[in-house]
Amino acid sequence: FSLRNSAANFTLDEIGSAVEYVHERGKKLYITLNIFAHNCHTSRMEQYLKELAEHPVDAVIIADPGVLSLVRDIMPDTACHISTQANCTNTRAADFWYKQGVKRVVLARELSLNEVSEISANSDCSTEVFVQGAMCISYSGRCYLSSYMANRGANLGDCAQSCRWKYSLVEEERPNEYYPIVEDGEYASVMSSRDLCMIQHIPEL
């Protein structure tokens, strides 16, 4: 139920072992459940949460209010963090989640450093930000390009990264003539944003 659907994710037994391992070392373990759930997912997620509740994870990271409701019903003592996929871009949004009992908000990747500072200074909610990683052509993963072109839902963890495919230019009166667009000597990912890199700004953060 995370947006890393193709990753080698942990089984519930492995999560149990991982919880013991990290807690013995004074660390924390979070579970990511940040898909935008449809009704067809909620019954399976409910069963998953009931089994997950047997393992004392430190927090779950979510984006969907419905998933928050499920976690509250099944794992009421587990902290909830809001994923960057929820697109929290202002102080009022951070405060809204805080009033729902959320402990931390991972702010939207589209914010400037000044905006991050302003929200962090004026909200009671703990904040977190990404400093490295891919940027979506849309606001934090709210993209339908993958669904349209590959029938793979980005918001369900199955993004085909269509924005990074190799594209050519076609003029409508010459449908069989493809004009190359070259950016880096190999191919052009004209719909792909530059990767996020805030390493130089870590001291300011």
Residue positions per predicted region:
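Conserved nucleotide-cofactor-binding alpha/beta core module
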Residues: 91-92
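As written
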Residues: 101-102
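Active-site pocket-lining/capping segments in soluble small-molecule metabolic enzymes
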Residues: 1-88, 106-110, 114-205
